[in-house]
């Protein structure tokens, strides 16, 4: 009967209580560290996620933020003044444009206090060159020219020795020393020269005008025979009629110089 109470039970071993105690201690310790580590891990992940999110949003803002330029730039771009200067028309001394488009040139004779009609031209540059040649004849080195560089070139050429007595530049003929050959002075506008003589001009002046490129272009003439040469040789009858009509307009409307004519 004494053994009936212990039937079906294992006999108790002394070392079994120690193993159970260690297992219970392990169950109490490891769950504590596991929960703490999971909390720390979640905190670290949350912190890293927040940091990465802030960096990403800051980068996106920098990309989408428009670039603002300083309007008070100390070195602003210079305005294009060269093109504006080319658009402005240059005014030449002794030249004015006719209502029908041609360019007229005239000069005031300082000795006679009268204006000398130089003719009409297709371009303003040709008319300005005619004025320069006449101004050099009347006033010499004191003349105010439209193209002073041409006069300087002619002066430099006159100091050279040897033939020829004239040179050509841009289809314009200039005599370096007219006194060496007074019989062949170029004058391409016979009609206006005759009118000048008819009004009391001095034939000895032998106006040496180079009007190449003008309306009444021609070849060189001897100044001694200009007054007797047929007018048809200077450009044809139709061209002379145009010259006569234009000169008649000059006599009718050209009694007073226009403003800024520079005569």
UniProtKB/Swiss-Prot annotation:
Localization of this protein: Nucleus
Location (main, coarse): nucleus
Extent of motif Destruction-box D1: 115-118
Gene Ontology MF terms: DNA binding; DNA-binding transcription factor activity
Post-translational modification: Cleaved by the APC/C-FZR1 complex.
GO cellular component labels: nucleus
Listed transmembrane segments: none
Compositionally biased spans, kind Polar residues: 54-73
Location of the region described as Disordered in the Swiss-Prot/TrEMBL record: 1-29, 54-88, 220-263
Keywords annotated in UniProt: Activator, DNA-binding, Ethylene signaling pathway, Nucleus, Transcription, Transcription regulation
Pfam families (alphabetical): AP2
GO biological process, any: ethylene-activated signaling pathway
Regions of compositional bias (Basic and acidic residues) in chain numbering: 12-23, 240-249
Extent of the signal sequence: none
Motif extent (Destruction-box D2): 150-153
Tissue: Restricted to dividing quiescent center cells.
Induction data: Up-regulated by brassinosteroid, but not regulated by ethylene.
Biased composition (Low complexity): 227-238
PROSITE patterns, sorted: AP2_ERF
DNA-binding region(s) from the entry: 91-148
Entry function: Acts as a transcriptional activator of the phytosulfokine PSK5 peptide hormone. Binds to the GCC-box pathogenesis-related promoter element. Rate-limiting factor of quiescent center cell division active when surrounding stem cells are damaged. Is a proteolytic target of APC/C-FZR1 complex.
Similarity annotation: Belongs to the AP2/ERF transcription factor family. ERF subfamily.
Protein name: Ethylene-responsive transcription factor ERF115
Organism expressing this protein natively: Arabidopsis thaliana (Mouse-ear cress)
Organism phylogeny: Eukaryota, Viridiplantae, Streptophyta, Embryophyta, Tracheophyta
Gene this chain is encoded by: ERF115
